[in-house]
Every structure is written in C-alpha cells, then in structure tokens.
Amino acid sequence: CASCHSMKYVSYRNLFEPGGPEFTEDQAKAIAAGFEVTDGPNSDGEMFVRPAKLSDKFVMPFANVKAAQAANGGAYPPDMSVLAKARSGGVDYIYSVLLGYEDPPSGVTLEDGVYYNKYMYGNNIKMSEPLSDGLVEYSDGTTASKEQMAKDVTTFLMWAAEPHLEARHKMGFRAILYLIILTILVYFSMKKIWSRIESEV
C-alpha cells in the first residue's frame, strides 16, 4: 500500500505507542530509518536529506499530487490515514473492495489499466488487485489467505484513523469511575448533613 498511498497524519512514533501495531521502539526506529526526508535549512541555508526519525510523519510516496497522478494513470491514490473513517461503510467497504476483484461480466469492456471490482463505486478501479494468497509470511504460521490479509489491512487502517482510541477509552473509563465514586461520596455526605439537620429540628 505504501508504494502508492500516503499516510500523512500518522507518525512513526505511533507504531510503538499503546494500542498500536505493538512494534518495539527500536523496531519503529528501524522502520523510520528506512525512509529519507528533506529537512533544513542547515547552517549554510541549504536543505538536506536525512533518515526519517520517530517524530516524522510517514514519508509520502510521491513528491506531489501531479507526480502521484502521473504514476497511476491519472488517478490520485487517496491518503490512507483516515480512509477507514472518511469512506462510507468504513472498514467493511475497504475489506470488500480488497476482495472484490473479478473478471468483468459478459459485455462489459474496460479500458487499459482499469480493473473490474464488484464493490467499487461504478465497478471500475485503476488499482490492480493488491492481494494474492501467500503474498506474505506470518511468523506464527497463520495462513496468508487474501481474506486474512484484507482483515489485517483494514484493522491497521482503523487504528491509523484513530491511533489514540484505546488511550481515550481508558481515560473515559477512569473519568466515569471517578464520577461514580464522587457521586457516592456526595450522596452519603448530603445524607449525613440532612440527618443532623432533621435531628436538630
């Protein structure tokens, strides 16, 4: 996916944060170092190229929109940072598109570089089928079926759309627990105060 699609709202440091893909910090650093970014200016006033760091956003595969369109038959690959939330149907739609490639029905003619996808709007897509059985190897021996890989891709994209979702859920739980305890304390405090008032009356 990264060869065509950008993820401009995700940083390399997100890869080892809680709730993410569970890389170690060293692994995330190694992934970042595999890409180069333009930085600067330096002390001479010139821009320079350096390996990416954890604080950098994911490196874009193309320099600009025009370059991306030129490399993809005029189509601009959408940014995948928030794709799971931006598209109607979310991850279910993305999962279906990844597995929706098939031969066009009889009588349907496609232009060169266009593929038939039964779940894509208009049934035409310029992205070739990205998944095939056995494309990757899982360290735990999981069978690399198209369905399994599509599930993994959509799970990753859902995380990328909200990398801090788990942290927010934990914070929300703590806030609710705090409010419950506070409510109980206030209730018993008020009950004690009113019992004194009633006894005096």
Regions found by a protein language model. Name each.
Residues 1-8, 153:
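The canonical Cys-X-X-Cys-His
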Residues 9-33:
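Acidic helix-start/capping segments at beta-turn-to-alpha-helix junctions
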Residues 38-122:
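Membrane-proximal low-complexity regions enriched in glycine and acidic/polar residues
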Residues 89-92, 103-108, 126, 134-138, ...:
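Substrate-binding/catalytic groove segments of enzymes
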Residues 121, 127-162:
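Extended, hydrophilic extramembrane loops/domains of integral membrane proteins
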Residues 168-173, 177-201:
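Juxtamembrane interface at the cytosolic side of transmembrane helices
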